[in-house]
UniProtKB/Swiss-Prot annotation:
Chain segments carrying region Disordered: 1-33, 206-287
TPR repeats: 51-84, 89-124, 126-158, 444-478, 532-565, 590-623
Compositionally biased tracts (Gly residues): 18-28
PROSITE patterns named among the record's database cross-references: PB1, TPR, TPR_REGION
Domain PB1: 317-396
GO cellular component: plant-type vacuole
Record flagged with keyword Lyase: no
Record's signal peptide: none
Keyword Coiled coil annotated: no
UniProt-recorded name of the protein: Protein PHOX4
Summary of the knockout phenotype: No clumped-chloroplasts phenotype. Phox1 and phox4 double mutants show no clumped-chloroplasts phenotype, but a 46% reduction in root hair growth. Phox1, phox3 and phox4 triple mutants and phox1, phox2, phox3 and phox4 quadruple mutants show a 70% reduction in root hair growth.
Induction: Up-regulated by abscisic acid treatment, and by cold, osmotic and salt stress.
Ranges of compositional bias, category Basic and acidic residues: 215-271
Length: 782
């Protein structure tokens, strides 16, 4: 990339205060200049050193994507450096890069920084490449083509310039533009040297002064006056003498066959002051000329309303806030901007929005939608009363976006941006207004031609629209009659019941997931110490208890959704049963008695589990009785759908499958209930409660209803912990024989082909191994 070249500055020796140029006066002036220059050089070294530190700090912030902080560091460095320093162009280009990273809306500011960089170093290729990228993004392809070509003239191997040049060239060719002719104009163009332009300006000034002296007062009055301001002095805040007025001089340069503006600014010598009592009108000032080759920036303030004048001048802008939820962005708009311009600026600031409404908050606090320019000006009139002007953006479907002053919703954003770019290039408001008028005439012509064509061929599209509207109206009326009828209410009730059952079933399955997670294995190394084992077991106990609580919560929510959902009641009963066993085995680590808190918690869980089992069993038996009598809710639904010929929506099992499934359901519920009572009898016996034998008797009854054999029941009773002939430990493992019964039923079911049902996964779920681990750890030898 090109390295910025520093400008050589020849400091002039200041004149003696007395105005003398000879002998001793010259000597004293020379001595004063040397001492002042030495102090100036020492201070400047400090400033330059600090500026370099700020430059490095800005580079680090840029790498961290803190673009605003980086620009602040670069700006501070620029204020410390002399204007002819070699790093000025680099800092300006770095600020342009920061603006480019902040979005398309900041590209005009990036172009401005590139222009300032090229003012400091006209052959700095990085600034040209950055500016070319900005022009390409803003659809100013001719300017992008020019800058890329200039860089390639200086550096044929510049990769970035080659990429931009090829892309822009391809787009221009697709648009039918003669790129070869443009390339011929730019092939030998080099950046204009600042020294050469300075010489041209001085020559023009000398000629204009001669014309003033010879032309007299009349010619002087006719010539236009301009006030020349030194931007460098204004930025540093130093005192400046009054600027002289001079004739407006233009420098015509041809780059690629196109004319560009060249702005000339003059800076007066700071070391010279006016004499208050002198007879002369004023001493002649020395002028340092600067020539800046700057392209017009594409900013929203350049686009003014159609009624504005065609004269070029500074457009008064207003700063507004664009509020989209929590995203608030600044924007600059002219005072007389139109609602279409505001729409385009919002699309540029929020490119992800496909459709939106523009709103403002009135004096009553309501958000009012803006659709016309008059409404926009009304919103601006509340600016003084309510503080800063805020425009609120509400995202909507593109079909719901309103038309803005005659513009259709389907107008392409690319076309709008091209129109704005073309307007900024031409700089003429009149042409923009003329294009709107031409567009209106063109639309009227299409409308008139369409009317003639329809009359000529006898084609009437309105009749089709009328037929469609009539058909939709009749269809809506018919649907309204069907929806409000008595039969529809019954169908709605069927649909509501099915959705209710579906929601409850989803919560049931959600709870089953947590029950499965509670069976997480405990990994204990073989050589682990007892302390490590207890620590691992305690962590597993906390995990399992949390999962049990989550499962119970989901089962209870399912019951709230569908109160007669017996599956959720049975699942809740099993969860409370397993939770009670977990708490009992965990309580064995300390001395267990009836008065302890752990014992009371275990008995409370057993009571809840029994209540849930009883309620679930009762609801299921009532539903089975209604089904057998033909008065169930499902039978009513089938009859209703059969009348409407929609009975195929329900799949019905055969009578044999229904009988087998009912028998299996009863067996599984009684088996689970018997296991619960058997385990409770063991707990009550250990706690010394006299009701343990009653629980054992009821458990035996439940096992008999479940279809267990007399031999298996006798083995269970014999191995109860209350029996003298029972095995050592906590008693017979009821879970093992229940699992054996389930496996026997599985084999039978596969032979008969009986379909499974919702609770079967719950009944098949094995007890967590954590129960055995807790029993072995806390009841074993210490």
């Amino acid at each position: 990339m090109g390295k910025p070249t520093a400008k050589k500055k020849n400091p002039e020796t200041p004149k003696d205060a007395s105005g003398g140029g000879g002998g001793g006066g010259g000597k004293s002036g020379k001595t004063y200049h040397r001492s002042t220059s030495r102090v100036f050089d020492e201070d400047m070294e400090i400033f330059i050193s600090r500026a370099l530190e700020l430059k490095e700090e800005g580079n680090k912030l840029f790498q961290k994507r803190d673009h605003e902080g980086a620009m602040l560091s670069f700006d501070k460095a620029l204020k410390l450096l002399p204007k002819d320093h070699i790093d000025v162009a680099y800092l300006r280009t770095s600020m342009a890069s920061c603006y480019m990273q902040m979005g398309l809306g900041e590209y005009p500011n990036a172009i401005s920084e590139c222009n300032l960089a090229l003012e400091a170093s006209p052959r700095y290729s990085k600034a040209l490449v950055r500016r070319s990228r900005c022009y390409e993004a803003l659809n100013k392809l001719d300017y992008a083509f020019r800058d890329a070509r200039i860089v390639l003239n200086m550096e044929p191997g510049n990769v970035s310039a080659n990429e931009i040049f090829d892309r822009v060239k391809k787009v221009l060719v697709d648009k039918g533009i003669d790129v070869d002719e443009m390339e011929k104009d730019f092939v030998d163009v080099q950046p204009v040297c600042a020294a050469r332009l300075k010489k041209i300006v001085k020559e023009r000034l000398r000629k204009s002064k001669k014309k003033k002296k010879s032309g007299g007062k009349d010619e002087e009055l006719k010539s236009p006056k301009v006030v020349v301001v030194d931007k460098g002095d204004e930025a540093e805040g130093r005192n400046k003498p009054k600027e002289e007025k001079s004739d407006k001089s233009d420098i015509d340069g041809k780059i690629g066959g196109k004319r560009e503006e060249k702005k000339t600014s003059f800076k007066s010598d700071k070391g010279q002051k006016k004499k208050s009592g002198g007879n002369k009108a004023g001493e002649e000032r020395k002028v340092e000329d600067k020539v800046v080759v700057m392209d017009k920036e594409v900013i929203a303030s350049e686009i003014v309303d159609g009624g504005g004048s065609k004269k070029e001048g500074a457009t008064v802008t207003r700063t507004i806030k664009l509020v989209h939820g929590d995203d608030i962005r600044w924007a600059q708009l002219p005072l007389d901007s139109t609602v279409r311009l505001v729409r385009d600026v919002i699309r540029d600031r929020f490119p992800a929005l496909r459709g939106f409404l523009i709103k403002y908050r009135d004096t009553e606090g309501d958000l009012v939608t803006i659709t016309t320019t008059d409404e926009l000006r009304l919103a601006a009139s509340t600016h003084d009363k309510l503080g800063s002007l805020r425009l609120y953006i509400a995202e909507v479907n593109p079909d719901q976006e309103p038309t803005y002053d005659g513009m259709s919703n389907t107008e392409s954003t690319d076309k709008v941006s091209k129109r704005l770019s073309s307007l900024a290039d031409n700089g003429s408001v009149g042409e923009y207004v003329g294009s709107d008028k031409a567009s209106g005439c063109f639309e009227n012509w299409i409308f008139q031609f369409a009317q003639l064509f329809k009359n000529h061929v006898g084609f009437d599209s309105d009749s089709y629209v009328d037929l469609h509207d009539l058909g939709m109206k009749l269809y809506t009326e018919a649907m309204e009659d069907a929806v409000t009828g008595e039969d529809a209410q019954e169908l709605f009730q069927i649909a509501a019941d099915k959705f209710q059952e579906m929601g409850a079933l989803a919560l049931l399955n959600w709870g089953n997931v947590h029950m499965s997670k509670a069976r997480k294995q405990v990994c204990i190394p073989e050589d682990a110490s007892r302390e490590a084992i207890i620590e691992a077991v305690e962590a597993a106990f906390v995990w399992t208890q949390n999962e049990y609580n989550k499962a119970a919560e989901k089962y209870e929510e399912a019951i709230k959704v569908k109160p007669d959902f017996y599956e959720a009641l049975l699942a809740l009963g099993q969860e409370q049963f397993e939770h009670a066993k977990l708490c009992w085995y965990h309580a064995l680590k300390s001395k267990v008695d009836l008065e302890s808190e752990a014992s009371q918690e275990v008995l409370k869980l057993y009571n809840k589990a029994e209540d849930s089992m009883e309620r679930g069993m009762q609801i299921w038996e009532e539903m089975e009785e209604c089904r057998l009598n033909g008065i169930s809710k499902l039978d009513k639904h089938k009859n209703m759908l059969r009348k409407l010929e929609l009975d195929e929506l329900f799949s019905e099992a055969s009578e044999e499958e229904t009988v087998e499934q009912t028998a299996n359901m009863s067996s599984q519920i009684n088996l689970l209930w018997g296991s619960l009572l058997y385990e409770r009898s063991i707990v009550e016996y250990k706690l010394g409660l006299p009701t343990w034998d009653e629980c054992l008797e009821v458990a035996v009854e439940k096992f008999e209803l479940a279809g267990a054999s007399a031999t298996d029941i006798a083995v269970m009773v014999k191995n109860h912990c209350s029996s003298e002939s029972a095995l050592e430990g906590m008693g017979f493992k009821i879970d093992e024989i229940v699992q054996a019964w389930n496996e026997m039923y599985d084999a039978k079911r596969w032979q008969m082909g009986v379909p499974s049902f919702r609770l079967e996964p719950m009944f098949r779920r094995r007890a967590p191994k954590l129960h055995d681990i807790l029993e072995n750890v806390f009841s074993g030898p210490v």
